[in-house]
């Protein structure tokens, strides 16, 4: 192999490495954004669950009345 062939191969490898670094950084940013969204959604679910428990606790007990169709 000639020096030119080696240089071409090294250039190709450097371009691949650069592309992979950019792709990894982009994917890292996407994952970070998604984790922030997941965290916010988990907090919302917990808050809604707490509100539901509070609403159920505040609801009066059902009366022992027959249904309206009787």
Swiss-Prot record:
Gene3D superfamilies on file: 1.20.5.300
**Any Pfam family:** SlyX
What family does the Swiss-Prot or TrEMBL record give for this protein? Belongs to the SlyX family.
State the HAMAP family in the record.
SlyX (MF_00715)
What name goes with this protein? Protein SlyX homolog
- Tell me which species this is from: Nitrobacter winogradskyi (strain ATCC 25391 / DSM 10237 / CIP 104748 / NCIMB 11846 / Nb-255)
Q: Gene for this protein?
A: slyX
């Amino acid at each position: 192999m000639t020096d030119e062939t080696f240089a071409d191969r090294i250039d190709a490898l450097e371009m691949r490495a650069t592309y992979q670094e950019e792709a990894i950084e982009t994917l890292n940013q996407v994952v970070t954004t998604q984790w922030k969204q997941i965290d916010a959604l988990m907090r919302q679910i917990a808050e809604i669950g707490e509100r539901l428990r509070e609403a159920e606790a505040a609801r009066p007990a059902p009366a022992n009345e027959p249904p309206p169709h009787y």
